[in-house]
Design a protein with these regions (language model features):
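Intrinsically disordered, glycine/charged-rich C-terminal tails and inter-domain linkers
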Residues: 1-42, 183, 192-246
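Catalytic NTP-binding/metal-coordinating core of nucleotidyl cyclase/transferase enzymes
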Residues: 42-124
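Catalytic core of nucleotidyl cyclases, primarily class III adenylyl/guanylyl cyclases
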Residues: 94-118, 138-177
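Serine endopeptidase catalytic core focused on the charge-relay Asp
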Residues: 129
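Alpha-helical oligomerization segments
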Residues: 186-187
Length: 246
């Protein structure tokens, strides 16, 4: 994600109107259906886009606004950095994770999942994240810092991948548009709160899981929609926690 401001430009309304026309007059046929393969970033321009089937995973901190009330800013910065650092490290360790974004206290990844086994792998990513939080909370307690609770949401669907920003400014970003991103974000905002477990997935994720992962999730109704939730952990990380976090 590129967001660094490299150069200051004088804004001119005439140039602005011309750029709007260039964008809005782009050919709809330049938006291609790539199905299950996420194209490389260098294939994106300011006038094209790719439709692709992906799995999105969001993780965010529960009640993060309350952390700002009870912690000094340097403390809060260290807590956030530790959380964000290890969320990115875990997602980045999986080859199928093609995009990672940080938005405030939320980290989300876009995963290429053309096979059923890939969907199981995303559940393994969620389990790693969940186990990592246990280790982080142990270290936070040792510092007498507040501990963190998180919510993780996972959804599979079709997204439109586009490049957005101001051409020539160095300020641009890959934007993922569609229900897959919005729904995964919504699930993360529900997970870990009230009676909900840490991890929530949709029905189209659940039906593609192996029997073992299915057995670790239970169903509930979210209005008229069935969801699945669990508190899945990574066994080797749990063993490390028991051995080293005493």
């Amino acid at each position: 994600m590129e967001s660094k401001k490299e150069t200051t430009y004088t804004y001119k309304v005439e140039d602005s109107a011309s750029r709007m026309d260039d964008i809005l007059d782009a050919n709809d046929n330049d938006y291609e259906d790539n199905k299950s393969s996420i194209p490389s970033r260098d294939k994106l321009t300011y006038k094209n886009g790719y439709y692709v089937n992906v799995t999105a995973l969001f993780i965010d901190i529960v009640d993060s606004s309350k952390l700002t009330d009870g912690n000094k800013r340097p403390t809060l910065a260290k807590m956030y950095r530790a959380f964000l650092s290890e969320c990115v490290a875990i997602m980045n360790s999986w080859e199928m994770c093609k995009e990672i974004n940080i938005n405030g206290d939320c980290v989300w990844g876009v995963f290429e999942t053309p096979k059923k086994s890939n969907v199981d792998d995303v559940i393994s990513v969620a389990a790693q994240l969940n186990s990592m939080i246990k280790i982080l909370n142990y270290k936070l307690k040792k510092k007498n810092y507040d501990t963190l609770a998180v919510g993780i949401g996972i959804y599979y669907g079709r997204a439109l991948m586009v490049k957005a920003g101001y051409s020539g400014s160095g300020i641009n970003e890959i934007v993922w548009m569609g229900d897959v991103v919005n729904t995964a974000c919504h699930l993360a905002n529900e997970a870990g709160r009230g009676y909900r477990n840490t991890i929530i997935v949709t029905g189209n994720i659940y039906c593609n899981l192996n029997d073992h992962h299915k057995s670790l999730l239970s169903s509930y109704n979210d209005g008229q929609t069935k969801r699945y939730e669990g508190d899945i952990i990574r066994n080797n990380m749990e063993d490390w926690y028991k051995e080293n976090c005493k």
